[in-house]
Amino acid sequence: HAVTVYDSLVTGHKQAVPNDATLVQADLSDSHALIETLTREKFDAVMHFAAFIEAGDSMKDPGRFFQNNFTNSLGLIENAVRAGVKRFVFSSTAAIFQSSEEPLSEESPLGPTNVYGHTKLMTEQTLEWYRQIHGLHFAALRYFNACGALPGRGEAHQPESHLIPL
């Protein structure tokens, strides 16, 4: 497959984009660039990893998180469907679940405890509606706090925000 990376590079890194991939440097809120890219490329699938991830910050500035994590995701989903995309992979989070002393499973009760988790749950629920209405096939990846990246590979945050720095 040919890969196109659509990234504002606000927190991303150009050097992480493979040489054989096409980079479109634009924000998801730029609907003109987004629509142009989606219609020009005729994608088989969209993999959506863009989001603010700092749960604590989401409680200090919720509007910023709702705008970036949910509203921009909705725009991407809607425009992808309009462009004929049939498959969508969404980078969600385990933060959509209620806090629990028990191990979590796919059947665990939903109940985010912060705005970050809520924006991810809203996006998952939106994808389910687009599946029902438009036939969009999707997968939501519900990560836990990641750790264990190899030196020189993986994520790069300044400042580092994970419990176990990558």
What are these language model-derived features?
Residues H1-P151:
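N-terminal Rossmann-like NAD(P)+-binding domain of SDR-like oxidoreductases, especially those catalyzing
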Residues D30, L163-L166:
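Alpha-helical structural motif
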Residues P112-T119, A156-I164:
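The catalytic Tyr-centered alpha-helix of NAD(P)H-dependent dehydrogenases
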